[in-house]
């Protein structure tokens, strides 16, 4: 069923929508036809058995990050902070299609490079509504467009509070539940102040924020849906902030592109967002991976940045200094690493290295097949070469991984 269409243009606005929606929206016809023609359509057969899904070809997943803050119990509202990207060269806008059944308010859109508001439109569309954010510049070739979106949803199906006791189900007045199917991205969920967890069915880190609220932090290595249900209850406990580094908010991803094994050389490519205040941050990667042929790119503009030595460290001169919490620099570091832990003996290749950060991918040379991996990982093929993709779910920011491979005859 079509909804009433209205467009509102401004950088920050409060909007309330009353939408008449069909709950079961079908996939677009073209996408459905594509999947029907594929031998790997994914999903389920009519009897509930699974159909094979497509092969993994992407070196990395989980580029977007979303944080949900549950607002006053009984309001049905939660505040969303969403970092997302647009990679199509020449694109001038980023579209955030939001879910049907929710009422959107208090939308704000920012440029993470400058921290300044961006113009956007928010419009009802068939079966839902969407934010169309105008990018500050067309996405350059070799670069990435990005935006920071804040919005508040009102959705009684997702966020429920209970005002009556139910001894049979151990419900007390004030209890809340929050249920959401969270597909594949890095996430955070913050409870209302004064609430404690009764249960959470997805493995996650737990921390206490500076405001004394409990927060879950997690990611899903499969990239598939996480049907999350949280039960929480008012508590008299007072929570004090805990030291915690949110590795799931950190978007760092490192590619180890293995060269000829006899050479011990690896082409390293790392992309991350720099949030530290200032104009000349150090490059942490070089502390554990000394690179030759070093190059640093500002991904907002696809232009190279100047680096310089500062004692034992290397710094980079940012295009825009970071002065507030909404700002970050989106950087890509590339270079060549000579690693004695990358060896070959006969027809057996071995990659043995301590890696850091949430996401690391090892891309094997052409003609090699994975024989073993010492850490939990997914395996795929990118442009004819096998890769091993790791997502670190532990709080420790480094771990040793050993990958062996055999050469095809």
PLM regions: where:
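Bacterial N-terminal signal peptides
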Residues: 14-28
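N-terminal, polar/Ser/Thr-rich
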Residues: 33-75, 196, 227-262, 301
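C-terminal beta-strand-rich structural cap/linker in extracellular carbohydrate-active enzymes
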Residues: 213-241, 386-409
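N-terminal secretory signal peptides that target proteins for export/translocation
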Residues: 1-13
């Amino acid at each position: 069923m079509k909804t009433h269409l209205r467009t509102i243009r401004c950088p920050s606005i409060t909007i309330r929508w009353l939408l008449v929606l069909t709950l079961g929206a079908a996939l677009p016809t073209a996408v459905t036809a594509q999947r029907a023609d594929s031998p790997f359509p994914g999903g389920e057969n009519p009897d509930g058995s699974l159909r094979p899904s497509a092969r993994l070809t992407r070196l990395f997943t989980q580029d977007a990050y979303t944080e949900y803050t549950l607002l006053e119990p009984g309001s049905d509202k939660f505040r969303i902070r969403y970092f997302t990207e647009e990679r199509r060269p020449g694109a001038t806008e980023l579209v955030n299609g939001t879910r049907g059944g929710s009422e959107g308010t208090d939308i704000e859109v920012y440029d993470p490079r400058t921290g300044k508001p961006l113009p956007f439109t928010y419009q009802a569309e068939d079966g839902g509504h969407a934010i169309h954010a105008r990018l500050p510049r067309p996405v350059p070739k070799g670069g990435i467009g990005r935006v920071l979106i804040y919005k508040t949803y009102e959705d009684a199906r997702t966020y429920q509070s209970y005002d009556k006791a139910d001894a049979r189900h151990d419900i007390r007045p004030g209890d809340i539940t929050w249920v959401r199917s969270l597909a594949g991205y890095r996430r955070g969920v913050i409870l209302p102040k004064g609430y404690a967890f009764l249960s959470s069915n997805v493995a996650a880190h737990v921390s206490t924020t500076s405001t004394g609220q409990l927060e879950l932090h997690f990611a899903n290595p499969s990239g598939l849906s996480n049907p999350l249900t949280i039960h929480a209850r008012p508590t008299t406990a007072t929570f004090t902030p805990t030291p915690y580094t949110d590795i799931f908010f950190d978007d760092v991803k490192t590619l180890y592109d293995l060269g000829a094994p006899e050479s011990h050389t690896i082409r390293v490519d790392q992309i991350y967002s720099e949030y530290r205040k200032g104009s000349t941050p150090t490059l942490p990667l070089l502390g554990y991976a000394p690179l030759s042929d070093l190059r640093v790119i500002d991904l907002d503009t696809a232009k190279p940045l100047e680096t310089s030595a500062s004692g034992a460290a290397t710094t980079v001169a940012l295009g825009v200094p970071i002065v507030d919490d909404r700002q970050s620099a989106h950087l890509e570091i590339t270079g060549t690493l000579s690693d004695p832990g990358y060896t070959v003996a006969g027809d057996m290749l071995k990659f043995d290295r301590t890696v850091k950060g949430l996401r690391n991918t090892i891309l094997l040379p052409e003609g090699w097949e994975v024989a073993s991996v010492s850490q939990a990982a997914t395996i795929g093929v990118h442009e004819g070469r096998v890769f091993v993709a790791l997502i670190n779910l532990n709080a420790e920011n480094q771990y040793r991984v050993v990958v062996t491979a055999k050469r095809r005859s």
